[in-house]
A protein has these predicted regions:
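Conserved beta-strand signature within the Rossmann-like core of class I S-adenosyl-L-methionine
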Residues: 140-146
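Conserved S-adenosyl-L-methionine
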Residues: 178-189
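Acceptor-substrate binding/catalytic loop of class I
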Residues: 19-23, 153-172
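A short glycine-rich, Lys/Arg-flanked "PGG" loop and its adjoining helix->strand segment in the class I
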Residues: 126-138
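A short His-aromatic
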Residues: 117-121
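A generic structural signal for alpha->beta connector loops
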Residues: 66, 88, 139, 177-180
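Conserved N-terminal segment of class I S-adenosyl-L-methionine
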Residues: 1-108, 112, 116, 126-129, ...
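Short aromatic-enriched loop/helix-cap "lid" or pocket-rim segments at secondary-structure transitions
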Residues: 155-158, 192-198
Length: 253
């Protein structure tokens, strides 16, 4: 397995940095808003496909206290961290192309599903979504986030195969058996600016994260992240310039 596909190593190395990442926090806020707006007062059963280290569940738990939360994640390290963070949720170590027998109990289970920052890491995004499809109820809503805009050296370092456009993610969802309701190009202008910083830093960003920071460097990094967290509140939900792609689709029965 290539290093950039070793998800145990990924979460062991990057778990803390991912939790503090203002871009991840921005995405989770967008997802939470979409889930809340479409809940229609019914108890939700939410499946996080590629649940990582559970940060989305941490965000959703207080906002949707009646919802049942389920996560599928390839990495045992990610599942362990997730279970510690959100003991009320259920997590499985799962390769959807070779699913464990326990997942059979969740066939048609999800009223809502999320697949956030996963599809850029797989060779066939449509095949991956088709493998996840059996765990969604007919008519279930799927929220997908994927990166748009240019790819950085750090993106390649952590295993990005491709970035997406509005048309490309729509095509992937349709091929996987979903009806696309809308695709937003979010994040303009300040997420784009943040991404330009990441692109400029390149592979050195991986060294920064691996080495850790102390003293003035740590203070500066935290200050920059705090500034972007504030600026991200001013981002547009949709414009033709946004580099954060957010799609909402429905499972076709």
């Amino acid at each position: 397995m290539p290093d950039h596909d070793n998800w145990n190593e990924h979460w062991d190395r990057y778990a803390a940095a991912a939790s503090q990442n203002p871009a991840q926090q921005m995405r989770h806020a967008l997802i939470a808003k979409l889930l809340q707006n479409g809940s229609e007062g019914r108890p939700a059963q939410i499946l996080d496909i590629g649940s990582g280290q559970g940060d989305l569940m941490v965000k959703l738990r207080p906002l949707l206290p009646q919802a049942k939360l389920l996560g599928f994640e390839l990495s045992p390290s990610g599942v362990k961290i997730s279970q510690e963070k959100v003991p009320e949720a259920t997590f499985f170590v799962a390769d959807l192309f070779q699913p464990p027998a326990e997942l059979q109990a969740y066939a048609g289970w999800a009223t809502d599903a999320v697949c956030s920052e996963v599809l850029e890491h797989v060779d066939s995004p449509a095949a991956f979504l088709r493998a996840a499809r059996p765990y969604l109820a007919d008519g279930a809503r799927l929220i997908v986030t994927v990166p748009g805009g240019p790819m950085s050296d750090f993106d390649r370092h952590i295993g990005h195969r491709q970035h997406f456009t509005r048309d490309l993610i729509s095509s992937v969802l349709q091929e996987a058996g979903f009806k696309v309701e809308c695709v937003y190009l979010s994040g303009f202008p300040f997420f784009n600016l943040y991404r330009c910083v990441v692109i400029a830093r390149g592979k050195k960003l991986a060294s920064d994260v691996d080495a850790g920071q102390a003293g003035f460097s740590a203070w500066l990094a935290n200050w920059v992240m705090m500034v972007f967290r504030g600026l991200f509140r001013l981002n547009l939900m949709d414009s033709r310039f946004g580099w954060q792609v957010v799609a909402v689709a429905r499972k076709i029965g």
